[in-house]
Structures are given as C-alpha cells and as structure tokens.
C-alpha cells in the first residue's frame, strides 16, 4: 500500500505495510501509547516520544513529555484511527505495534511522521520492526532542521561517543551517540564497537546477533567501522 505523508516534503511512499484493525481512541497514556474502544492498547511503532512516569516509582518525567502527550491527544483523542503493521504486530505486553493513520480536515495524517516532524519524538526501531524507516528519518530530519520540540532541548542533544563520563550519567536512557569507532571486534555472536582505547572504561556499542542479521541484509559488515 502507499502511505500518505503529512506534508509535501514527506510524500515518499512506503509499500511495506499491511492493513490492521481500526477503532476509536478512548484514552492516552503518553506521547506514543493509547487505548482503543476495542480494548486494544496501541504503541506507535518506529518512534519514541518523551517518557512520563506512568506510576513508576522514582522515574522522572522527560522534558516535553506532557507536550508530546497533549499533541497526541489533539491528533487522535476521540477519533477513529486505522492501524497498519510492518513487522512484529504485538509486544510482550500484548500492545499493538502499529503505524497509525487518522483523518484530519479531510486529509489522512500519519501520526508517527507528524510527531517526528513536530520534534516531539525520535525514530526508534527494532530488528523485527523496521518498515518505513527512510520516511520516518526524513520526518525526524525535518523536525531537527527546524529545531522544534526536543531538538532545542539539551536533554536530547546528540552525545559525544568519546565523552564516557557524560555518557555514564545517562545510563539507562535512550541516547543518540556519534563519534569515531577506534576498534571494531567480533566476539562470539556479538560485535563490539569501541569508542575509546580502554573498553572496560570507555563507551562501547554492542550489536547483538539479531542486529547483525539486519546489517547482513543491508550488505554492511560492521567490522568496517574499525578505526573509521
């Protein structure tokens, strides 16, 4: 199928999705999760919005979490939405992992792309759910170029892979990290990308076997990043 974009700049097509169920949105948890009147909980696959505590002890809300939730409410609350699947359709909690379309003012809006374009989410993919990433990254790039939402907040800044002390302070979070890989090494079923000389102390990215299959399908050997 052809997925409509949310603006002319995002008019690329994505032919990998299959139509799923539809329903009316009756409650919203945060900027990427809501419930339908059918009882199905939907997790917007392919993106991650700023997180809220949602009853978790000691969990601090991420900046712009309330704004992301308010935007989703404005987009879909009380509206009939259509779900589309491009990979694994359920997570371990039983939530639908779906791309979501909603009609607004006579036009179909792709909710994930809209949140990215507004700078209220980042692309967030898994090996078993990578459909439409090119279009999603284009939407994210637009939000970043316009410095909207999270892209003007230091909390979401792209981290330096060589600054291991700063990264240590971000343990447990989801970060975008860039830098030079000083060493790439395969050990068993994993590949380690080391951004420092002392792997026990410096930042290291680990590619598990499932992720390595994605690299293989793309024709990329991650070992080429050695000293790159």
Give, region by region, the residue ranges found by the protein language model:
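Small beta-barrel nucleic-acid-binding modules, primarily SNase/OB-fold domains
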Residues: 5-228
